[in-house]
Regions:
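Polar, enzyme-active/binding microenvironments
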Residues: 1-191
């Protein structure tokens, strides 16, 4: 056999403005404009900041702490934070961001933290995480209610975050887990 060599264009990292509040365990949505919410464990776990491509702005805080929540959305004006941790417990609470405020939505079925999320505010998923142990549970959001769907093949927590849509998602978690969802089932991918 022969090897085929290909090259890809290289990208470059650049510095940008610093967030107003130091955070860890927060979840983000977006690309050049972004939203970060729920960073920090304890008093900071309700923080929300948006990024306009140049600077960060402190926004209305979440109603409930969602540290290491499952998050998904399309932009800095349309996002969801689902479940997560608000010391000392995992929470079932879900909130939707409309660009200026958080609104409580229907609760998830299983409280967990460290799970992933994918999709938009009217069609999303949260998957994996830690409940009373590491879980493979996947729940689907239709804009008004949560339904448990096909579980991940491998229970995972501290998921790096999900990407994609409700019917075409990818879950990447430590140390080398990689699964895709086609709207019906999860499939293991090369790690």
């Amino acid at each position: 056999g022969a090897f085929k060599i290909s090259t890809e264009g290289a990208g470059a990292w650049a510095s940008s403005a610093t967030m107003n509040t130091a955070t860890y365990g927060g979840r983000g949505i977006g690309t050049t404009t972004a939203l970060v919410g729920a960073g920090g464990d304890g008093s900071d776990d309700k923080n929300t900041e948006t990024y306009n491509g140049t600077a960060w702005t402190t926004e209305t805080a979440l109603n409930t702490g969602h540290y290491i929540a499952g998050s998904f959305g399309a932009s800095s004006t349309s996002a969801m934070m689902a479940s997560g941790y608000d010391a000392p417990i995992n929470v079932v609470d879900v909130e939707e961001w409309n660009g200026s405020a958080w609104t409580e939505k229907a609760n998830v079925n299983t409280a967990r933290r460290g799970g992933g999320g994918a999709g938009i505010v009217t069609a999303g998923l949260i998957f994996g995480g830690y409940s009373t142990g590491i879980v493979a549970i996947c729940e689907s959001w239709n804009g008004s209610a949560w339904t448990e769907t096909a579980d991940l093949n491998t229970a995972q927590e501290d998921i790096f975050q999900g990407i994609g849509t409700q019917t075409a998602s990818q879950c990447v978690g430590p140390p080398t887990e990689n699964e895709t969802f086609n709207g019906t089932s999860w499939s293991e991918q090369a790690e």
